[in-house]
Amino acid sequence: MSTNQGSLWGGRFAGGPSDALAALSKSTHFDWALAPYDVTASRAHAVVLFRAGLLTEEQRDGLLAGLDSLASDVADGSFGPLVSDEDVHAALERGLIERVGPDLGGRLRAGRSRNDQVATLFRMWLRDAVRRVATGVLEVVAALGDQAAAHPTAIMPGKTHLQSAQPILLAHHLLAHAHPLLRDVERIVDFDKRAAVSPYGSGALAGSSLGLDPDAIAADLGFTTAADNSVDATASRDFAAEAAFIFAMIAVDLSRLAEDIIIWSSTEFGYVTLHDSWSTGSSIMPQKKNPDIAELARGKSGRLIGNLTGLLATLKAQPLAYNRDLQEDKEPVFDSVVQLELLLPAMAGLVGSLTFDVERMAALAPAGYTLATDVAEWLVRQGVPFRSAHEAAGAAVRTAEERSVGLEELTDDELAAISPELTPQVRDVLTIEGSVSARDSRGGTAPKRVAEQLQIVREITARLGHELMR
């Protein structure tokens, strides 16, 4: 049997927990990440206890001095958890008592439970973590924007179903990856509105009878308000699930970008060359240059999706209020942040270092009869109903396929035989440059529209960067 050393409970028990229970309960291997936030919250709690008349000025100052010393030692690594410490809270209380003595150190726990304490610390940690992640996402967006700006007129094959569809600008495609990532950052900004609610003062579930001021401690800790319901405040982890979703969505968006890079860098496509610093080789095949960053991004998306679904499964069917199941809420979220902080700078570097073969992309852009839609729309502009225009353009494709030529290589007689409306003037739209320039609706792939889109992406990026600094 173990002793009760390192725990914040025990008076009701005749002995300590079994070794197996102690090992199962221990959480310092992951919740130590909350230690700096725990000390910060303890400082605010000491002030609130003083305001409530539960500490003298001398006791308050003594606790604050002890907490300052503890914070310094936690920061430089000279203080850490012992094997006997059950969790971060127990370890830090031990550290405080070592510095100020058991009488003064033991007063700090008044009016708070680990239930409201950990819910508060988790929110504090997450609010900082999502900002770091958002900054990394914006760096990937900046890399996409820089590549788009560097290739304002480069044309590539646009795909649907991974089949040739219509010519588009490379910049248009790159910016299409930027927008989902910007929406992810917008989700982070919006998430903070709900995360900025302090559970502190809720106690175990029913609130406090000691005259504490939850609003004051919320303000001291940088929250916008205190929780309206103490049961909800201690029992709910929807904020963690929301963050886990955002992280998973970021990973999915990165995975789609990564998939494009993997395909584009293949010999068969040959759209991009990977920079040596952002790719790897093979242990047996000397010629290989592998897109490992992109492949790891694709793989890690599954990991982050798993973190989200695992957390949701943990949360379902828990009765109110707090349950020990909630010890399992932090590791998946912590892991998602760790993975994104590894992945985002690597993806930004990969994207920024890509070398595009714009001549090859342009040469492949008309392949697969991607100008067929332009033929149909040209006929519409001549007054032909779209149904008939679609049939005529399809027939032109079939004729070109039979001859193994491009649409632009069909003779005037062949075009006229398909439809009398297909006059030689249709050749005006049978170029990839003409096709791209013609699609000048808002959001379209015409160069002037894509230039507008780049400006919009940069404006949104700047706005979000400013909002994250608040």
Curated annotation (Swiss-Prot):
What does the record give as EC number?
A: 4.3.2.1
Gene3D superfamilies in UniProt: Fumarase/aspartase (C-terminal domain), Fumarase/aspartase (Central domain), Fumarase/aspartase (N-terminal domain)
Q: Its domain of life?
A: Bacteria
Keyword annotations: Amino-acid biosynthesis, Arginine biosynthesis, Cytoplasm, Lyase
This protein is called Argininosuccinate lyase
One of the entry's Gene Ontology molecular-function terms is: argininosuccinate lyase activity
Which InterPro entries would you find in this protein's record? Arg_succ_lyase_C, Argininosuccinate_lyase, Fumarase/histidase_N, Fumarate_lyase_CS, Fumarate_lyase_fam, Fumarate_lyase_N, L-Aspartase-like
- GO cellular component term, pick one: cytosol
Pathway it acts in? Answer: Amino-acid biosynthesis; L-arginine biosynthesis; L-arginine from L-ornithine and carbamoyl phosphate: step 3/3
Could you tell me where this protein is found in the cell? Answer: Cytoplasm
Give the reactions, separated by semicolons, that this protein catalyses.
2-(N(omega)-L-arginino)succinate = fumarate + L-arginine
From the UniProt record, report the name of the gene that encodes this protein.
Answer: argH
> Which GO biological process annotations does it have?
arginine biosynthetic process via ornithine; L-arginine biosynthetic process
